[in-house]
């Protein structure tokens, strides 16, 4: 890459970053937090944060990258996607009407709410315990990270249930919403994340998500300022780098340490070069249509229920890794949100996907506002827990693609909804057995004596 080509890419990168960052800043000033702000920051991080890191790798370490024209296409496709997304998100689909009282879809009481978070926590802890009994601490047993996807590891499907510990702790926080509950959420979820990191053998997702939710709650409540958020972001990058070194068993120093930091940070937070790599191989893609979305559900179907289930799930990430790149190392390479759309339908699917994503984020914000207006604090805690719990699915949406997001959000909705139903059923059984008693508030001693 020549300096002239780099200068052109730099101008496009600066304009695109300024465009998205400005819109995000105005939205932040208006509402402080909503899921549009979160998605915008995540999109900016995924598709634009990596450009400076790539530039240093190219000019400092002479690392090979995609041709400049392909990198330009990646930057422009990301900027255009966001433009279509933002217009869709801001477009009002119907006239604003004065809120009319309507019968709620469901309601919650104190016992049902506590039963819900206990059930969610139980799902996570039981899954971790079973996985541990089968595999032990994989971090100290396996020699490479790719081995966690091999036949040596049993009960891999259980990992999908680990995450429900975070929504459980979110319910606990939203019932109190004070600084002590906020700090308890951080300590409990990060401790659980470190435990799963050691048991699974290097999966950092639970730690990243817990820390991100903690920061956003702090921003909403005014407990964290922007400079504190920036400092926490730097700390998070360093922490994820250290965990990555441990995961891959790397021992580096000097220039090698700097090089490793750059490429691991880029791959962890901003895999934008994967999109460029996909566009570079555009002519090798046999567009898959909506099949990757359907195929991604296969992993949730046990083999005893479907004996003929394909052992290889050809979602967009696996198609990109195996069919386009001919890479069979055992690890799937994330195509990113835009890349998954390209795999499904080429360039035409990029604006269509942006419209779909705009509607998805609009729905989550509607649900979040519903929780903010809800007078029943128990129901509000459940709604907020569901919304913030879905942050992991939004990270999957931007990093992995639309197909992975759809299957995971449906799975999350089913498990969360089933936990609610079980909690309500248990409450009904306990109430029928006469085990539920209304809380009575005792009068102060002085008032009691006065009444006597």
UniProtKB/Swiss-Prot annotation:
Family annotation (InterPro entries): WzyE
Compartments, record wording: Cell inner membrane
Organism: Salmonella gallinarum (strain 287/91 / NCTC 13346)
One GO cellular component term noted in the UniProt record for this chain: plasma membrane
Keyword Transmembrane: yes
Function recorded in the entry: Probably involved in the polymerization of enterobacterial common antigen (ECA) trisaccharide repeat units.
Key words, A-Z: Cell inner membrane, Cell membrane, Membrane, Transmembrane, Transmembrane helix
Transmembrane annotation, as ranges: 6-26, 37-57, 63-83, 118-138, 155-175, 181-201, 207-227, 228-248, 341-361, 378-398, 410-430
Name of the gene encoding the protein in the UniProt record: wzyE
Name of the protein: Probable ECA polymerase
Keyword Acetylation in record: no
Protein family according to the UniProt entry: Belongs to the WzyE family.
């Amino acid at each position: 890459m020549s300096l002239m080509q780099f200068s052109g890419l730099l101008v496009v990168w600066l304009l695109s970053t300024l465009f998205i960052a400005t819109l995000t800043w105005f939205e932040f000033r208006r509402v402080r937090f909503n899921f549009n702000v979160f998605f915008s920051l995540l999109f900016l991080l995924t598709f634009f944060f990596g450009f400076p890191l790539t530039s240093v790798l190219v000019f400092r370490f002479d690392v090979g990258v995609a041709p400049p024209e392909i990198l330009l296409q990646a930057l422009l496709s990301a900027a255009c996607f966001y433009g279509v997304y933002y217009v869709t998100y801001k477009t009002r689909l119907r006239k604003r009407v004065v809120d009319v009282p309507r019968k709620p879809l469901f309601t919650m009481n104190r016992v049902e709410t506590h039963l819900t978070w206990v059930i969610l926590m139980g799902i996570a802890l039981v899954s971790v315990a079973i996985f541990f009994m089968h595999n032990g601490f994989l971090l100290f047993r396996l020699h490479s990270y790719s081995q966690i996807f091999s036949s040596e590891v049993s009960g891999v499907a259980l990992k999908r249930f680990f995450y429900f510990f975070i929504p459980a702790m979110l319910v606990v926080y939203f019932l109190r919403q004070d600084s002590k509950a906020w700090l308890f959420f951080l300590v409990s979820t990060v401790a659980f994340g470190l435990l799963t990191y050691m048991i699974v053998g290097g999966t950092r997702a639970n730690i990243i998500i817990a820390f991100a939710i903690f920061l956003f709650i702090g921003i909403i409540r005014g407990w964290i300022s922007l400079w504190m958020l920036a400092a926490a972001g730097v700390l998070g990058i360093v922490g994820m780098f250290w965990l990555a070194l441990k995961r891959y068993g790397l021992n580096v120093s000097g220039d090698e340490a700097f090089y490793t930091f750059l490429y691991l940070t880029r791959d962890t937070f901003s895999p934008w070069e994967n999109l460029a790599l996909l566009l570079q191989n555009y002519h090798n893609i046999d567009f898959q249509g909506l099949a990757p979305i359907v195929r991604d559900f296969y992993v949730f179907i046990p083999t005893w229920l479907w004996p003929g289930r394909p052992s290889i799930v050809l979602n967009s990430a696996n198609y990109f890794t195996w069919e386009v790149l001919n890479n069979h190392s055992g690890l799937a390479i994330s195509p990113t949100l835009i890349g998954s759309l390209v795999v499904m339908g080429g360039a035409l699917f990029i604006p269509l996907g942006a419209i779909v994503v705009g509607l998805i984020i609009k729905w989550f914000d509607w649900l979040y506002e519903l929780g903010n207006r809800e007078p029943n604090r128990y129901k509000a805690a459940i709604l907020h827990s569901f919304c913030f719990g879905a942050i992991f699915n939004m990270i999957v949406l931007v990093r992995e693609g639309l197909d992975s997001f759809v299957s995971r959000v449906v799975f999350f909705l089913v498990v969360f909804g089933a936990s609610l139903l079980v909690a309500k059923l248990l409450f009904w059984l306990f109430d029928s057995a006469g085990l539920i008693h209304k809380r009575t508030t005792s009068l102060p001693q002085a008032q009691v004596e006065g009444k006597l």
